[in-house]
Amino acid sequence: MLKTKVAVQVISPGMLPDDAIMLGDAYLRQWKIPQGQPLTLKFGAMRQYVKVVPVERFDGMRIGQSLARKMGLLANTTLRIRYRPEEAQLALGPLIGVLISRDDPEQRDRPFGSITMFCKELVDACEAQGAYVYFFTPLHLKGNYNTVEGWVYSDGWRKTLLPSPDVVNNRLTSRKLENRPNVQEFIQEVKIRHRSTVFNEKFLDKPEVFEALAKDPSLIKYLPESHVLKSFPMLKTMCSRYHTVFLKPVRGSLGKGIIRITKMEADAYSAQYATVGGTRRHYFSSLLKLYGSISGKMKTVRYQIQQGLQLIDIMGRPVDFRALVQKNETGKWVLTSIVARTAGSHHFVSNLARGGTLSTVREAVGRSNLSGSSSSEAPGKLQRAALDIAHGVDNFIPAHFGELGIDLALDTSGRVWLLEVNSKPSKNDNTPLQDQKIRPSVRNMIRYARHLAEF
């Protein structure tokens, strides 16, 4: 298999037969492409038999307007080209499709709302690496999965019809959208019919992650005791073991709906609720009365009950860490970034949506109440934990992931704990602490897509 980058030019009608392409003769000589014999030209799911016309002193590809339109190829695009002699196939790509939650055609400058800049970063990264990306929503999936109507960027955002992609990056931000029949049908069809790869193909529930990772003895050290809360006896047992426990919605995000339960004097308990404006606290004379106050919520919200941890803090504000791990150009997990998140005043969760602030790991650890010897070891321990956990997710959860947001914590003895694994990490939450045009996380995403598509 041979591959390189090539500039694709679309030429006027009549200059080239519809079943022919022009290619620099150096490619034909180097790759021993037979002249006069038809090849299969591939772009995403689209395939077309073509004859190759060699052109001297030319290092690009020329394709007629009619064939380019049929293949979904845009003019003046630099792509990677791959030749497989055993299949007599010339492929252009990779063609990457990003499945997003919604679009707004009326907002031409910001058709994807708050993630528009992230989408433009992907476009720029693809241009630099010789890939092509488009964006589509569940509403664009109409049943013919050979082609998809999607958004492309060429001097502005516009919609066009494109082949189904080589690689799909699932960036849907709601389980309701992800579970739509047309989305699930599309994912299965492109994987089976077109041999496309879909990564980050599903959301992760908290109990699913903890139960899976507990199968690996080497990962148990990172796992606070956790269970799905089903009854009062379970709450009573956990509260007898730990001074503080947390109730977290199984399918929650951004710190929404978390309840911290703390044992007070005698048999009294306090329950603190995370809200946008701060923490709301209620007191109960018994654990049974506290349970009665949440049992109504439990009819509609499943909770994970988790061991409370004595986390490091800065002036009483808890600190945790968000690691972004991604697969690289060889398919191996690497740590792309890790940042510290310090809870806002009057909050016990650190999410930015709840007033948290970002800093580097070393800065946060250095300002925290962690002892000096543990503090110097903390960055390395956090990095190792993030990669260990990513491998565990790969090994024990039957789904394909290319990036994970892993929330970690340090207790006051310097031990690393897992809080949560997110298969759809928010791009805002992972904003680097330095300003760059294209984030490393975006470059890595394209490199991994190239690896999957073998470009």
Model regions: which residues?
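Glycine-rich phosphate/pyrophosphate-binding beta-alpha loops
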Residues: R341-V349, N422-T431
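Short beta-strand segments enriched in small/hydrophobic residues
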Residues: G93-D104
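A long amphipathic alpha-helix within ATP-dependent nucleotide-binding catalytic cores
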Residues: S285-A409, P440-F455
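Short beta-strand-centered segments at strand-helix junctions
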Residues: L2-L92
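A short beta-strand motif that forms the metal-chelation/ATP-contact edge
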Residues: R322, L408-S423
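Redox-cofactor binding/interface segments in oxidoreductases and associated redox assembly factors
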Residues: V98, N169-N170, L247
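Active-site nucleotide/adenylate-binding loops and adjacent lid/helix of ATP-dependent enzymes
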Residues: L2-M22, R29-P38, F186-R193, T197-Q306
